[in-house]
């Protein structure tokens, strides 16, 4: 039996996941993080993107995170997300439309603030589409 630890993924609206996992993969402020059992304690910001949860027996779940905080303690990991949406609950057409609008905004932006905001919106839309794609593959 593989080693596991307890994971809680919580958003402002609801608890998205609580249970034993073998590992997770998430994008922290300094880059991609793989958290395995026995990981050193850590507290870091999470960038908008996905969390890949590998549950017991290798089953995977993907959740979109709009950002938040990751806390790693011995035997327990907590993700406090600004917004969290399960892959199967994301709307692909809506994400595609958000991506298109952000791309238009980038091409027509004139100021640094407009460009930065449009880039952030584009990154969120691309992350949502990636979660949708991976969720479909896992099913």
UniProtKB/Swiss-Prot annotation:
Keywords: ATP synthesis, Cell inner membrane, Cell membrane, CF(1), Hydrogen ion transport, Ion transport, Membrane, Transport. It comes from Escherichia coli (strain K12). Produces ATP from ADP in the presence of a proton gradient across the membrane. This is ATP synthase epsilon chain. Transmembrane segments: none annotated. It comes from the Bacteria. It is found in: Cell inner membrane. Its main location: membrane. It is a peripheral membrane protein. F-type ATPases have 2 components, CF(1) - the catalytic core - and CF(0) - the membrane proton channel. CF(1) has five subunits: alpha(3), beta(3), gamma(1), delta(1), epsilon(1). CF(0) has three main subunits: a, b and c. Gene3D superfamilies: ATP synthase delta/epsilon subunit, C-terminal domain (1.20.5.440), F0F1 ATP synthase delta/epsilon subunit, N-terminal (2.60.15.10). GO terms for cellular component: plasma membrane; proton-transporting ATP synthase complex.
């Amino acid at each position: 039996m593989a080693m596991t630890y307890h994971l809680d993924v919580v958003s402002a609206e609801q608890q998205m996941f609580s249970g034993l996992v073998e590992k997770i993969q998430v994008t922290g402020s300094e880059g991609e993080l793989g958290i395995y059992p026995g990981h050193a304690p850590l507290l870091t910001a999470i960038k908008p993107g996905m969390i890949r949860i590998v549950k017991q027996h290798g089953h995977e779940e993907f959740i979109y995170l709009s950002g938040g905080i990751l806390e790693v303690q011995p035997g327990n990991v907590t993700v406090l997300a600004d917004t969290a949406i399960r892959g199967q609950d994301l709307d692909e057409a809506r994400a595609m439309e958000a991506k298109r609008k952000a791309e238009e905004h980038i091409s027509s932006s004139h100021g640094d603030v407009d460009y930065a905001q449009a880039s952030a919106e584009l990154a969120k839309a691309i992350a949502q589409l990636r979660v949708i794609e991976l969720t479909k593959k896992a099913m």
